[in-house]
Amino acid sequence: VEANSKLGLISGLVGALAIGPLLGIGHFSAAAALLIGVAFFGAATIAARQLPKEAIAPKPAEAAERLELRSAGIVLASAAMMSIRGVIGFLTFHLLFWIREDYGLAQFGLAAAASTLGSMAGNLVAPRLRRALREEVMLTIALSVIAGAGIAAAMTGGLLTAILVAFVANFSAAIGRLAFDSIVQRDAPDANQGRAFARYETRFQLAWVMAGLPPVFFTMPGQVGFVVVGVVAAF
């Protein structure tokens, strides 16, 4: 779990280093920024294909694995994590279109940077929190903080508030993810970890995508979006 936290920290650091130059390039040529992104993804694909081909789950899941992954604790934790990931997807696109319309695309770069810094900080703090708190408590705190931030932002509004919400939400999401990973490893010792986490991550990514669709189709006022964030995280 701590290894995953370190990987998240590294990916956040790389993203933070790349976002500044790309924003500068995008200011002069959006096509150039997109081409650079395509080049990076292409290089990553080539590197991934060079990894050793190993079967993570050569055999179907056994009864013990299925039973453990259906335990109440894991089911509730996965539902909580799905809510968190959905909120992050919604918030990302809500901020993109709202800030672009009301303030400008450059200001969205500040929110994107705050999101990256929040994820990095969460991955840095989460292992330390895990030594002091139970994983269920960490997940509850993560949801509560996101809900509180959303409601507070709905009451105040403004660009600075949006940037703070982006930081807090991604900070809490990183903590929640480490807590979820720990719960699965603790409560499903007989499960194939690679297979289990691949399935959960697929569900979480789908939640991120589906929750991001409404603000793509309907640009809503900033404070309305923050109400949605607060309500979804609260329930």
Language-model features: where?
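A membrane-interface helix-boundary motif in multi-pass transporters
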Residues: 23-39, 106, 216-234
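Structural signature of the two symmetry-related core transmembrane helices
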Residues: 35-38, 137-152, 230
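Helix-to-coil boundary motifs at intracellular loop junctions of multi-pass secondary transporters
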Residues: 98-104, 132-133, 154, 183-188
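Helix-loop junctions at membrane interfaces in 12-TM secondary transporters
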Residues: 154-166
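Helix-loop boundary and gating motifs at the non-cytosolic
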Residues: 64-115
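Substrate-agnostic recognition of the 12-TM MFS/MFS-like secondary transporter fold
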Residues: 1-26, 49, 84-88, 115-127, ...
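Helix-loop junctions on the cytosolic side of multi-pass membrane transporters
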Residues: 37-62
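MFS-fold secondary transporters
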Residues: 48, 149-154, 169
